[in-house]
Amino acid sequence: LNLVDQLGEADEELAGTYAELGDWCAQRILQHVQR
């Protein structure tokens, strides 16, 4: 059960990291398009 809980927490952290990366990429693309 501990391993499952740890994996669940890790997945949430990864999801948040990927969400931030997605926002960063989107901003870079928008800036490039505006130029």
UniProtKB/Swiss-Prot annotation:
Its EC number is 5.1.3.8. It catalyses: an N-acyl-D-glucosamine = an N-acyl-D-mannosamine. The keyword Isomerase applies. Residues 1-21 are annotated as: Leucine-zipper. One of its GO terms (molecular function) is peptidase inhibitor activity. The keyword Isomerase applies. Pathway: Amino-sugar metabolism; N-acetylneuraminate degradation. Transmembrane segments: none annotated. Keywords: Isomerase. GO terms for biological process: N-acetylneuraminate catabolic process. Catalyzes the interconversion of N-acetylglucosamine to N-acetylmannosamine. Involved in the N-glycolylneuraminic acid (Neu5Gc) degradation pathway. Homodimer. Forms a heterodimer with renin and inhibits its activity. This is N-acylglucosamine 2-epimerase. It comes from Canis lupus familiaris. The gene is RENBP.
